[in-house]
Design a protein with these regions (language model features):
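Glycine/threonine-rich ATP-lid/beta-loop region of ATP-binding domains
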Residues: 1-133
């Protein structure tokens, strides 16, 4: 699934996606020692701000300005905060090579319909990044 975060476009592998929704303020919580959470069907899911992980924006957006995509890897769930859903398509993963090989949370790149490169997210790698914080 192609998503937008700030001016960037990312591809989230559909096999990892549980659901996408727009949470209300009553579904957003900050839990001491655990950080930001989103409530879904009675469960609290840790919130991941992609713009903070990849440094695309210094502005902390309000939860009611965004969507979340709930993803799962190895029976662990996280809610990725995004700005918009841009569509669902099939993409071929291309190795980005060079200095991009070691970027945690990025599986590769894909050429998008507009000719630009979208970064393909490695969901398990993102989970590792946020676990280290």
């Amino acid at each position: 699934m192609l998503v937008g975060v700030d001016e960037e476009k990312y591809v989230i592998p559909t096999i990892t996606i549980q659901k996408a929704f727009k949470p209300g303020q009553d579904e957003y919580f900050t839990v001491e020692g655990k950080g930001e959470m989103v409530k879904d069907r009675g469960s609290l899911i840790p919130l991941v701000r992609l713009n903070e992980i990849y440094g695309t924006s210094k502005n902390k957006k309000s939860i009611d300005q965004c969507l979340v995509v709930v993803v799962e890897s190895k029976e662990e769930k996280r809610a990725l905060m995004i700005d918009e859903l841009l569509g669902k398509d099939e993409y071929v993963i291309k190795n980005l090579g060079g200095s991009m090989d070691d970027v945690q949370g990025i599986a590769g790149g894909a050429i998008l319909a507009d000719g630009k490169v979208g970064l393909i997210l490695d969901v398990h790698g993102i989970f590792s990044i946020v676990s280290q914080k």
